[in-house]
Protein backbone atom coordinates (compact mmCIF):
# COMPACT_ATOMS: atom_id res chain seq x y z
CA UNK A 1 0.00 0.00 0.00
CA UNK A 2 1.40 3.35 -0.93
CA UNK A 3 2.12 5.63 1.99
CA UNK A 4 0.45 8.30 -0.10
CA UNK A 5 -2.90 6.49 0.10
CA UNK A 6 -2.98 7.19 3.81
CA UNK A 7 -1.10 10.42 4.11
CA UNK A 8 -1.83 12.75 1.21
CA UNK A 9 -4.36 15.45 0.44
CA UNK A 10 -6.82 15.38 -2.50
CA UNK A 11 -5.86 17.04 -5.75
CA UNK A 12 -6.02 20.79 -5.76
CA UNK A 13 -9.26 22.37 -6.89
CA UNK A 14 -9.41 25.88 -8.24
CA UNK A 15 -11.59 27.60 -5.66
CA UNK A 16 -11.15 30.12 -2.85
CA UNK A 17 -9.83 28.84 0.45
CA UNK A 18 -12.19 29.12 3.41
CA UNK A 19 -10.74 29.32 6.91
CA UNK A 20 -13.04 28.81 9.88
CA UNK A 21 -11.87 30.33 13.15
CA UNK A 22 -13.87 30.16 16.40
CA UNK A 23 -13.52 33.20 18.63
CA UNK A 24 -11.88 32.40 21.89
CA UNK A 25 -14.41 31.90 24.63
CA UNK A 26 -17.41 31.77 22.28
CA UNK A 27 -19.16 29.15 20.20
CA UNK A 28 -19.78 31.05 16.93
CA UNK A 29 -17.08 30.84 14.30
CA UNK A 30 -15.70 33.21 11.74
CA UNK A 31 -15.43 32.14 8.13
CA UNK A 32 -12.73 34.01 6.28
CA UNK A 33 -12.86 33.63 2.53
CA UNK A 34 -9.45 34.02 0.95
CA UNK A 35 -9.24 34.24 -2.82
CA UNK A 36 -6.82 35.33 -5.50
CA UNK A 37 -8.30 37.89 -7.87
CA UNK A 38 -7.32 37.61 -11.51
CA UNK A 39 -8.47 39.92 -14.26
CA UNK A 40 -7.88 37.58 -17.17
CA UNK A 41 -8.88 33.90 -16.71
CA UNK A 42 -6.94 32.91 -19.83
CA UNK A 43 -3.73 34.01 -18.12
CA UNK A 44 -4.62 32.34 -14.81
CA UNK A 45 -1.49 30.21 -14.59
CA UNK A 46 0.70 33.22 -15.12
CA UNK A 47 -0.84 35.35 -12.40
CA UNK A 48 1.48 35.92 -9.45
CA UNK A 49 -1.28 35.00 -7.00
CA UNK A 50 -1.67 31.49 -8.42
CA UNK A 51 2.02 31.04 -9.15
CA UNK A 52 2.75 30.60 -5.45
CA UNK A 53 -0.29 28.50 -4.55
CA UNK A 54 0.38 24.93 -3.34
CA UNK A 55 0.03 22.26 -6.01
CA UNK A 56 -2.43 20.40 -3.77
CA UNK A 57 -5.53 21.79 -2.13
CA UNK A 58 -5.17 23.11 1.41
CA UNK A 59 -8.56 22.26 2.88
CA UNK A 60 -10.73 24.47 5.06
CA UNK A 61 -8.80 25.02 8.26
CA UNK A 62 -9.87 25.77 11.81
CA UNK A 63 -7.81 28.22 13.84
CA UNK A 64 -7.39 28.89 17.58
CA UNK A 65 -9.66 26.09 18.78
CA UNK A 66 -8.04 25.56 22.18
CA UNK A 67 -10.00 27.10 25.09
CA UNK A 68 -8.27 29.41 27.55
CA UNK A 69 -8.33 26.91 30.40
CA UNK A 70 -6.34 24.44 28.29
CA UNK A 71 -3.76 27.11 27.51
CA UNK A 72 -3.18 27.49 31.24
CA UNK A 73 -1.95 23.89 31.30
CA UNK A 74 1.02 24.82 29.12
CA UNK A 75 1.80 27.82 31.28
CA UNK A 76 1.78 25.55 34.32
CA UNK A 77 4.13 23.11 32.54
CA UNK A 78 6.94 25.63 32.00
CA UNK A 79 8.97 24.49 35.02
CA UNK A 80 8.50 20.89 33.92
CA UNK A 81 9.64 21.77 30.38
CA UNK A 82 12.72 23.52 31.77
CA UNK A 83 13.71 20.48 33.81
CA UNK A 84 12.49 17.55 31.68
CA UNK A 85 12.37 18.76 28.06
CA UNK A 86 15.39 21.01 27.53
CA UNK A 87 17.90 18.32 28.67
CA UNK A 88 17.08 16.45 25.43
CA UNK A 89 18.92 19.20 23.55
CA UNK A 90 22.66 18.79 23.04
CA UNK A 91 25.08 21.68 23.65
CA UNK A 92 26.45 23.02 20.37
CA UNK A 93 30.04 22.25 21.41
CA UNK A 94 29.09 18.59 21.95
CA UNK A 95 27.15 18.26 18.69
CA UNK A 96 28.24 16.78 15.39
CA UNK A 97 28.45 19.11 12.40
CA UNK A 98 28.03 18.32 8.68
CA UNK A 99 31.71 18.95 8.03
CA UNK A 100 32.57 15.98 10.27
CA UNK A 101 31.36 13.70 7.45
CA UNK A 102 32.53 15.63 4.38
CA UNK A 103 35.86 16.15 2.56
CA UNK A 104 37.87 19.02 4.06
CA UNK A 105 38.06 21.76 1.39
CA UNK A 106 41.25 23.39 2.69
CA UNK A 107 43.51 20.64 1.31
CA UNK A 108 43.24 20.43 -2.49
CA UNK A 109 44.71 16.96 -3.02
CA UNK A 110 42.86 15.33 -0.14
CA UNK A 111 39.61 17.04 -1.08
CA UNK A 112 39.66 15.88 -4.69
CA UNK A 113 40.68 12.36 -3.70
CA UNK A 114 37.81 12.06 -1.24
CA UNK A 115 35.30 13.45 -3.74
CA UNK A 116 36.48 10.85 -6.26
CA UNK A 117 36.00 8.15 -3.62
CA UNK A 118 32.45 9.34 -2.95
CA UNK A 119 31.61 9.34 -6.65
CA UNK A 120 33.14 5.90 -7.11
CA UNK A 121 31.22 4.46 -4.14
CA UNK A 122 27.88 5.84 -5.25
CA UNK A 123 28.00 5.31 -9.01
CA UNK A 124 26.36 1.86 -8.84
CA UNK A 125 23.70 2.72 -6.25
CA UNK A 126 20.29 2.43 -8.00
CA UNK A 127 18.21 5.46 -8.91
CA UNK A 128 15.30 4.40 -6.70
CA UNK A 129 17.48 4.77 -3.62
CA UNK A 130 18.55 8.25 -4.68
CA UNK A 131 14.93 9.25 -5.33
CA UNK A 132 14.07 8.34 -1.74
CA UNK A 133 17.22 9.92 -0.28
CA UNK A 134 16.54 13.13 -2.20
CA UNK A 135 12.92 13.12 -1.00
CA UNK A 136 14.10 12.69 2.57
CA UNK A 137 16.62 15.50 2.15
CA UNK A 138 14.04 17.86 0.64
CA UNK A 139 11.75 17.12 3.57
CA UNK A 140 14.55 18.09 5.95
CA UNK A 141 15.38 21.23 3.95
CA UNK A 142 11.83 22.56 4.39
CA UNK A 143 12.72 23.26 8.03
CA UNK A 144 11.68 26.96 7.85
CA UNK A 145 8.10 25.75 7.38
CA UNK A 146 8.25 23.53 10.45
CA UNK A 147 9.61 26.25 12.72
CA UNK A 148 6.99 28.64 11.39
CA UNK A 149 4.26 26.09 12.01
CA UNK A 150 5.37 25.35 15.57
CA UNK A 151 5.30 29.08 16.21
CA UNK A 152 1.60 29.15 15.36
CA UNK A 153 0.81 27.02 18.43
CA UNK A 154 -1.01 28.99 21.10
CA UNK A 155 0.57 28.87 24.55
CA UNK A 156 4.00 27.66 23.45
CA UNK A 157 5.05 29.81 20.48
CA UNK A 158 8.02 32.15 20.51
CA UNK A 159 6.22 35.46 20.97
CA UNK A 160 9.24 37.70 20.34
CA UNK A 161 11.68 35.69 18.25
CA UNK A 162 14.01 35.51 21.22
CA UNK A 163 11.75 34.55 24.11
CA UNK A 164 13.34 32.74 27.06
CA UNK A 165 10.22 30.67 27.69
CA UNK A 166 11.33 27.00 27.76
CA UNK A 167 8.85 26.24 24.97
CA UNK A 168 10.39 28.96 22.76
CA UNK A 169 13.93 27.88 23.65
CA UNK A 170 13.03 24.32 22.67
CA UNK A 171 11.56 25.35 19.30
CA UNK A 172 14.63 27.40 18.36
CA UNK A 173 17.20 24.87 19.57
CA UNK A 174 15.32 21.94 18.02
CA UNK A 175 15.31 23.85 14.73
CA UNK A 176 19.05 24.46 15.03
CA UNK A 177 19.71 20.76 15.54
CA UNK A 178 17.44 19.75 12.67
CA UNK A 179 19.07 22.30 10.36
CA UNK A 180 22.19 20.14 10.14
CA UNK A 181 20.26 17.20 8.64
CA UNK A 182 19.24 18.74 5.33
CA UNK A 183 22.53 20.62 5.13
CA UNK A 184 24.58 17.43 5.36
CA UNK A 185 22.44 15.34 3.00
CA UNK A 186 22.33 18.18 0.47
CA UNK A 187 26.11 18.54 0.37
CA UNK A 188 26.71 14.80 0.16
CA UNK A 189 24.23 14.36 -2.67
CA UNK A 190 25.87 17.24 -4.53
CA UNK A 191 29.27 15.56 -4.27
CA UNK A 192 27.98 12.23 -5.63
CA UNK A 193 27.07 13.75 -8.99
CA UNK A 194 24.14 11.34 -9.13
CA UNK A 195 21.29 13.83 -8.87
CA UNK A 196 20.17 16.91 -10.80
CA UNK A 197 20.79 19.52 -8.13
CA UNK A 198 18.98 22.33 -9.94
CA UNK A 199 15.74 20.36 -10.01
CA UNK A 200 16.29 19.33 -6.40
CA UNK A 201 16.80 22.97 -5.42
CA UNK A 202 13.68 24.01 -7.32
CA UNK A 203 11.69 21.40 -5.42
CA UNK A 204 12.97 22.76 -2.10
CA UNK A 205 11.96 26.30 -3.06
CA UNK A 206 8.53 25.18 -4.21
CA UNK A 207 7.98 23.21 -1.01
CA UNK A 208 9.00 25.98 1.39
CA UNK A 209 6.86 28.43 -0.57
CA UNK A 210 3.86 26.10 -0.35
CA UNK A 211 4.00 25.60 3.42
CA UNK A 212 2.13 22.65 4.89
CA UNK A 213 -1.42 21.70 5.82
CA UNK A 214 -0.72 20.67 9.42
CA UNK A 215 -4.30 20.66 10.73
CA UNK A 216 -2.95 21.87 14.08
CA UNK A 217 -5.69 24.51 14.56
CA UNK A 218 -3.04 26.46 16.56
CA UNK A 219 -3.61 23.80 19.23
CA UNK A 220 -0.45 22.57 21.01
CA UNK A 221 -2.12 19.25 21.84
CA UNK A 222 -2.40 18.61 18.10
CA UNK A 223 1.04 20.01 17.39
CA UNK A 224 2.91 17.84 19.87
CA UNK A 225 0.97 14.71 18.85
CA UNK A 226 1.96 15.41 15.25
CA UNK A 227 5.63 15.97 16.04
CA UNK A 228 5.73 12.78 18.13
CA UNK A 229 4.43 10.85 15.12
CA UNK A 230 6.68 12.58 12.61
CA UNK A 231 9.90 12.28 14.57
CA UNK A 232 9.36 8.54 14.85
CA UNK A 233 8.56 8.36 11.13
CA UNK A 234 11.80 10.16 10.23
CA UNK A 235 13.75 7.99 12.67
CA UNK A 236 12.46 4.91 10.84
CA UNK A 237 13.04 6.39 7.39
CA UNK A 238 16.62 7.52 8.01
CA UNK A 239 17.38 4.25 9.77
CA UNK A 240 16.27 2.32 6.71
CA UNK A 241 18.25 4.50 4.30
CA UNK A 242 21.28 3.82 6.52
CA UNK A 243 20.65 0.08 6.28
CA UNK A 244 20.36 0.22 2.49
CA UNK A 245 23.48 2.38 2.17
CA UNK A 246 25.40 -0.34 4.02
CA UNK A 247 24.00 -2.93 1.60
CA UNK A 248 25.18 -0.81 -1.33
CA UNK A 249 28.66 -0.47 0.16
CA UNK A 250 28.69 3.22 1.14
CA UNK A 251 29.68 3.10 4.80
CA UNK A 252 30.02 6.89 5.03
CA UNK A 253 26.49 7.47 3.76
CA UNK A 254 25.24 4.79 6.15
CA UNK A 255 26.91 6.64 9.01
CA UNK A 256 25.37 9.94 7.88
CA UNK A 257 21.85 8.51 7.76
CA UNK A 258 22.35 6.63 11.02
CA UNK A 259 23.56 9.76 12.80
CA UNK A 260 20.53 11.71 11.59
CA UNK A 261 18.27 8.84 12.69
CA UNK A 262 19.77 9.01 16.19
CA UNK A 263 18.89 12.72 16.38
CA UNK A 264 15.34 11.98 15.28
CA UNK A 265 15.03 9.28 17.95
CA UNK A 266 16.12 11.73 20.65
CA UNK A 267 13.63 14.31 19.39
CA UNK A 268 10.91 11.65 19.26
CA UNK A 269 11.57 10.83 22.90
CA UNK A 270 11.26 14.50 23.84
CA UNK A 271 7.99 15.10 22.00
CA UNK A 272 6.39 11.87 23.23
CA UNK A 273 7.35 12.90 26.76
CA UNK A 274 5.41 16.16 26.34
CA UNK A 275 2.31 14.27 25.24
CA UNK A 276 2.79 11.71 28.00
CA UNK A 277 2.67 14.59 30.50
CA UNK A 278 -0.48 15.93 28.83
CA UNK A 279 -2.12 12.51 29.20
CA UNK A 280 -1.19 12.61 32.88
CA UNK A 281 -2.65 16.10 33.42
CA UNK A 282 -5.60 15.98 31.01
CA UNK A 283 -6.33 12.43 29.78
CA UNK A 284 -9.72 13.33 28.33
CA UNK A 285 -8.47 16.28 26.29
CA UNK A 286 -5.40 14.36 25.17
CA UNK A 287 -7.21 11.25 23.95
CA UNK A 288 -9.73 13.39 22.07
CA UNK A 289 -6.93 15.37 20.45
CA UNK A 290 -5.15 12.17 19.38
CA UNK A 291 -8.34 10.73 17.90
CA UNK A 292 -9.02 14.01 16.10
CA UNK A 293 -5.56 14.06 14.54
CA UNK A 294 -5.85 10.45 13.39
CA UNK A 295 -9.28 11.06 11.88
CA UNK A 296 -7.89 14.04 9.97
CA UNK A 297 -4.89 11.84 9.07
CA UNK A 298 -1.31 12.60 9.96
CA UNK A 299 -0.06 14.04 6.68
CA UNK A 300 3.65 13.98 5.97
CA UNK A 301 5.19 17.46 6.20
CA UNK A 302 6.34 17.37 2.55
CA UNK A 303 2.96 16.41 1.09
CA UNK A 304 2.86 19.65 -0.95
CA UNK A 305 6.11 18.70 -2.71
CA UNK A 306 6.39 19.86 -6.33
CA UNK A 307 9.22 20.26 -8.84
CA UNK A 308 7.44 22.35 -11.46
CA UNK A 309 6.68 19.25 -13.53
CA UNK A 310 5.09 16.43 -11.57
CA UNK A 311 1.85 17.37 -9.81
CA UNK A 312 1.92 14.05 -7.94
CA UNK A 313 5.58 14.13 -7.00
CA UNK A 314 5.04 13.36 -3.32
CA UNK A 315 2.80 10.38 -4.12
CA UNK A 316 5.43 9.03 -6.52
CA UNK A 317 8.29 9.54 -4.05
CA UNK A 318 6.19 7.87 -1.33
CA UNK A 319 5.44 4.91 -3.60
CA UNK A 320 9.16 4.34 -4.26
CA UNK A 321 9.89 4.63 -0.52
CA UNK A 322 7.20 2.01 0.10
CA UNK A 323 8.55 -0.35 -2.57
CA UNK A 324 12.17 -0.31 -1.38
CA UNK A 325 11.15 -0.54 2.28
CA UNK A 326 12.26 2.86 3.57
CA UNK A 327 8.86 3.98 4.87
CA UNK A 328 5.69 1.95 4.44
CA UNK A 329 2.04 1.85 5.39
CA UNK A 330 2.99 -0.88 7.86
CA UNK A 331 5.35 1.63 9.49
CA UNK A 332 2.47 4.10 9.77
CA UNK A 333 0.36 1.54 11.65
CA UNK A 334 3.37 0.52 13.73
CA UNK A 335 4.01 4.11 14.81
CA UNK A 336 0.42 4.46 15.95
CA UNK A 337 0.66 1.21 17.93
CA UNK A 338 3.90 2.40 19.51
CA UNK A 339 2.38 5.73 20.58
CA UNK A 340 -0.77 4.10 21.94
CA UNK A 341 1.41 1.88 24.13
CA UNK A 342 3.71 4.74 25.09
CA UNK A 343 0.81 6.88 26.25
CA UNK A 344 -1.11 3.92 27.77
CA UNK A 345 -4.25 4.83 25.83
CA UNK A 346 -5.89 1.43 26.24
CA UNK A 347 -5.67 1.56 30.04
CA UNK A 348 -7.16 5.05 30.42
CA UNK A 349 -10.12 4.79 32.77
CA UNK A 350 -11.22 7.36 35.29
CA UNK A 351 -11.49 10.90 34.08
CA UNK A 352 -12.73 10.15 30.56
CA UNK A 353 -15.96 11.70 29.35
CA UNK A 354 -18.30 9.87 27.01
CA UNK A 355 -16.57 11.51 24.07
CA UNK A 356 -13.21 10.57 25.54
CA UNK A 357 -14.23 6.91 25.82
CA UNK A 358 -15.42 6.90 22.22
CA UNK A 359 -12.09 8.39 21.16
CA UNK A 360 -10.28 5.69 23.13
CA UNK A 361 -12.30 2.91 21.46
CA UNK A 362 -11.66 4.38 18.02
CA UNK A 363 -7.91 4.63 18.60
CA UNK A 364 -7.50 1.14 20.01
CA UNK A 365 -9.09 -0.46 16.94
CA UNK A 366 -7.45 1.82 14.37
CA UNK A 367 -4.08 0.04 13.88
CA UNK A 368 -5.78 -3.21 12.89
CA UNK A 369 -8.08 -1.35 10.51
CA UNK A 370 -5.06 0.28 8.87
CA UNK A 371 -3.33 -3.09 8.56
CA UNK A 372 -6.39 -4.65 6.91
CA UNK A 373 -6.52 -1.77 4.43
CA UNK A 374 -2.83 -2.30 3.72
CA UNK A 375 -3.31 -6.02 3.10
CA UNK A 376 -6.18 -5.43 0.68
CA UNK A 377 -4.21 -2.73 -1.12
CA UNK A 378 -1.18 -5.00 -1.41
CA UNK A 379 -3.36 -7.75 -2.86
CA UNK A 380 -4.67 -5.33 -5.49
CA UNK A 381 -1.15 -4.13 -6.32
CA UNK A 382 -0.05 -7.70 -7.01
CA UNK A 383 -2.66 -7.94 -9.76
CA UNK A 384 -1.35 -4.98 -11.73
CA UNK A 385 2.05 -4.19 -13.16
CA UNK A 386 3.94 -1.41 -11.41
CA UNK A 387 4.32 1.68 -13.59
CA UNK A 388 7.47 3.72 -13.90
CA UNK A 389 7.64 7.49 -13.56
CA UNK A 390 10.22 10.00 -14.73
CA UNK A 391 11.90 11.83 -11.83
CA UNK A 392 13.56 15.16 -12.55
CA UNK A 393 15.83 14.57 -9.52
CA UNK A 394 17.66 11.78 -11.38
CA UNK A 395 17.90 13.61 -14.72
CA UNK A 396 14.47 12.50 -15.91
CA UNK A 397 15.19 8.79 -15.75
CA UNK A 398 12.27 6.43 -15.17
CA UNK A 399 11.98 4.80 -11.75
CA UNK A 400 9.53 2.02 -10.92
CA UNK A 401 6.86 2.89 -8.35
From Swiss-Prot:
Ubiquitously expressed with a preference in leaves, flowers and stems. Disruption phenotype: Reduced omega-7 fatty acids accumulation in the endosperm. The endosperm oil of double mutant aad2-3 aad3-3 lacks omega-7 fatty acids. Pathway: Lipid metabolism; fatty acid metabolism. It is found in: Plastid, Chloroplast. It is an enzyme of class 1 (oxidoreductase). Keywords: Chloroplast, Fatty acid biosynthesis, Fatty acid metabolism, Iron, Lipid biosynthesis, Lipid metabolism, Metal-binding, Oxidoreductase, Plastid, Transit peptide. One of its GO terms (molecular function) is metal ion binding. Coiled coil: none annotated. Its main location: plastid. Fe cation 1 binds at residues 140, 178, 181, 264. The record marks 216 as: Confers substrate specificity. The keyword NAD does not apply. Its EC number is 1.14.19.2. Residues 1-35 form a transit peptide. Residues 1-31 are annotated as: Disordered. Binds 2 Fe(2+) ions per subunit. Belongs to the fatty acid desaturase type 2 family. Converts stearoyl-ACP to oleoyl-ACP by introduction of a cis double bond between carbons 9 and 10 of the acyl chain. Also able to convert palmitoyl-ACP to palmitoleoyl-ACP at the C9 position. Exhibits delta-9 palmitoyl-[acyl-carrier-protein] desaturase (PAD) activity. Involved in omega-7 monounsaturated fatty acid biosynthesis, especially in the endosperm oil. Homodimer. This is Stearoyl-[acyl-carrier-protein] 9-desaturase 3, chloroplastic. The gene is S-ACP-DES3.
